[in-house]
Swiss-Prot record:
CDD domains: CMP-KDO-Synthetase. Activates KDO (a required 8-carbon sugar) for incorporation into bacterial lipopolysaccharide in Gram-negative bacteria. Keywords: Cytoplasm, Lipopolysaccharide biosynthesis, Nucleotidyltransferase, Transferase. Its main location: cytoplasm. It comes from Rickettsia felis (strain ATCC VR-1525 / URRWXCal2). HAMAP family: KdsB. This is 3-deoxy-manno-octulosonate cytidylyltransferase. The keyword Transferase applies.
Length: 246
């Protein structure tokens, strides 16, 4: 298998404020978390784990051959859960990069995961995250996050508002992060910052503390399931691709 020095961790917590028991919601006959895991597993990396506080989620993943790490339900964020899971990986001293894939993207493309790994390894950024070029209509449709970057693709700011103001094209931020090990360790040691709390975006903690985030372009915006409406969109998308035999 490729990238033996990389761990992919999918944090998945049973409790959810906007969509009850979100990881267990069905898309077709398959739970959300199983779909996410199967997509991620196509990247074919040995160190792929689901980090959870739930026996039910763990059993689902184990039945399809996945590896599970149990983490405390009191852990506040997905990034903290990712770090706690990383510390519990056997022989983790050989892992230098950690990819945090959110457990709510049932159609995430494995190629996007591999792209951020390659980009991270061939750059000097602390963290790398994918972005998609979109028009105004695409990002106005829901509470998406956009990012402003410099000429080299280094992130300058992330916002739930459309940035840069007045533009017609935007960079949609895909909620997936590739960390250098020392960057993840530093991130979880830092206290939440003013901008992070104002925008409700963890990644601003990174920028406010002088760390760097590189962006890499990917082709498609993955569906994220946070609400009942999102779930309906995911089910409809699944039904459409099923009709096409994809």
């Amino acid at each position: 298998m490729q990238h033996q020095d990389v761990a992919i961790i999918i944090p998945s917590r049973l409790s959810s404020t906007r969509l009850k028991q979100k990881p267990l919601q069905l898309i077709g006959s398959t739970t959300l978390i199983e779909r996410v895991f199967k997509q991620v597993n196509q990247a074919n990396l040995e160190h792929t784990y689901v980090a959870t506080d739930s026996e039910e989620i763990a059993n689902i993943i184990k039945k399809v051959g996945g590896k599970v790490i149990f983490t405390d339900s009191a852990i506040p964020t997905g990034t903290d859960r990712t770090y706690e899971a990383f510390k519990l990986i056997p022989n983790n001293q050989n892992i230098n990069y950690i990819v945090n894939v959110q457990g709510d993207m049932p159609f995430i493309e494995p190629s996007s995961i591999l792209k951020i790994i390659e980009y991270l390894k061939n750059s000097e950024y602390d963290i790398v995250t994918p972005v998609v070029k979109v028009d105004r209509e695409s990002v106005e449709a829901s509470s998406n996050v956009t990012v402003a970057v410099d000429s080299a693709g280094k992130a300058l700011y992330f916002s739930r508002s459309l940035i840069p103001n007045g533009a017609e094209k935007f960079l949609y931020h895909v909620g997936m992060y590739g960390f250098r090990k020392n960057a993840l360790e530093k991130f979880v040691s830092l206290k939440p910052t003013f901008l992070e709390k104002t925008e409700r975006l963890e990644q601003l903690r990174v920028l406010e503390n002088g760390m760097t985030i590189g962006t890499c372009l990917v082709e498609n915006v993955p569906i994220s399931v946070d609400t009942e409406d999102d779930l309906k969109k995911a089910v409809k998308f699944y039904e459409n691709i099923s009709k096409l035999g994809l």
